[in-house]
Amino acid sequence: LGGIASHSQEQLKKIPVPFVLSTVSLLGKEYKNDYSFVSVDDVKESCRMTEHLISQGHEKIALLCSYKEDVSIGALRLTGYKKALEAHNIPVDERWIRHMDPELDSYSMESGYRMTKALLEEGVDCTAIFAISDSLAIGAVRALIDAGKRVPMDISVAGFDGTEMAAYYNPSITTIRQPAETMAKETIKLLFDSIKKKTNVQQLIFEGELVPGESVKK
């Protein structure tokens, strides 16, 4: 869930049927006003989570991110993370930023586990980990527990997406919940309106919700 469409305008023009981009946006694209989309503002929501961690006393915050080449969800949430640190005059330490291994499944718990294990093995000093998806966060928690760390007493962990799995994990994951059901309904409505030619192009940006869990030390 989330991100920015990586398709070019030429590619989108070739689609022969009405369509609506769902959970991805065209924000920042020159042709953003030409197509309908439904999404959250990934930069804003990632910034919100990072600022939440800062408000809980954390300044050394590691980020479990997407592939280095990613120009979609990973790039947007990385931008939000950096924006929050800079707003609080916290220098960005590139050692804190970890990218997924392209040979592993994207956004998998194994990816989160491996990135966190590497952080620990390299002795990177951090008090919190912000994973840009709940699955990465769960993998991070497991790696910390396997290393003898206590979550959140030793290291706090936060995620993003607001999945049911994050709510029922132990400890429950502090996360940004996307209004997935509402977004799905609005996407379908826009699509049918487009098919029936009832509406012009629309862009709907929804607010995420910060859901406190047990994985962040208060």
What are these regions (language model features)?
Residues 1-6, 135:
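Short beta->alpha connector loops
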Residues 9-218:
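Bacterial carbohydrate/catabolite-sensing allosteric modules
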